[in-house]
Amino acid sequence: MDPGPGLAALQAWAAKSPAYGAANQTVVDKVPPDMMHMIDPHWYQFPPMNPLWHALLGFTIGVLGFVSISGNGMVIYIFMSTKSLKTPSNLLVVNLAFSDFLMMCAMSPAMVVNCYYETWVWGPFACELYACAGSLFGCASIWTMTMIAFDRYNVIVKGIAAKPMTSNGALLRILGIWVFSLAWTLLPFFGWNRYVPEGNMTACGTDYLSKSWVSRSYILIYSVFVYFLPLLLIIYSYFFIVQAVAAHEKAMREQAKKMNVASLRSSEAANTSAECKLAKVALMTISLWFMAWTPYLVINYTGVFESAPISPLATIWGSLFAKANAVYNPIVYGISHPKYQAALYAKFPSLQCQSAPEDAGSVASGTTAVSEEKPAA
């Protein structure tokens, strides 16, 4: 049976590497000599990966990079060029898109080239910069999402008593996010852990296989401040957000029964509904972020505690899921943000395949308007 040109091409790719399937060959054989000092002895026990995995990873990362760079670039352009979207709350959305945009600009092209050569080809210092960039932008993304959750908590739970976030307040939060993220990601350059090639040899990350507990402590403490603490803060925010929304809806239904009407919805209630919609969007985005980064955390903890063997193939999935995070945010906000859609279709009519959403259904801009009308505390 003829395998077809596509399968034949993949088989030819797999056959071109004499190392794959050969005896006494390891996954580190193609690593350049100037990087051998960075390779942990753990990886010498594994044979070369099937070139098909490198091809699949390179293709997937290339697609994710294209979608993320174009999608996040579009989000940044639309939000910054549309007057009605230039609100304090949306500055956090822009910062999130900016972080994801830079992540894929820094990581996707380099990894595609590495997958073609089936090893890291950019040298030791570029490996460290690559890993530092992934850590920096990942940290910035999760803390930006945490600030978005706090903003929703302030508007929805505290209501009219809340002090609205100003542009200066949003910019100060963004500055704090980047300073905090940069501080954590620079520490490995000063001896607390280090950045090394991962098991697939096409990406770089933190050294979670080190036997030194000083080095291991970086992984553990970093995960507390960049994974578990934001998670707890976000859960706290959304617990009270859901509680407040449920109480509001219950009060509305009870009042409607007393007045013998179907609904008490008014323009003010519509604004509250918009707040609830944005809370759902943010919660979805955050859930996708944790789905993306949890596999990488599990791999790091598995290495630190030596609870199970880690294969080069397993490290591929950690890299893939982590980078997929940069694709989720523009999709989520583009689908569920009517005012963003309206601005997008106005600037790029060719993208419109259905009638433009009504501007009155705005989510993010509507919530900001509610906030800005409140008196300062």
UniProtKB/Swiss-Prot annotation:
A GO molecular function held by the record: photoreceptor activity
CDD domains: 7tmA_photoreceptors_insect (cd15079)
InterPro entries: GPCR_opsins, GPCR_Rhodpsn, GPCR_Rhodpsn_7TM, Opsin, Opsin_lateye, Retinal_BS
Tissue: In the retina, expression is abundant and uniform in the anterior-posterior and oblique cells of the retinulae, with some expression in the proximal cells. There is no expression in the dorsal rim retinulae (at protein level).
Transmembrane segments: 59-79, 93-113, 130-150, 170-190, 221-241, 281-301, 313-335
GO cellular component: rhabdomere membrane
Name of this protein: Opsin-1
The species this protein was found in: Manduca sexta
Gene: OP1
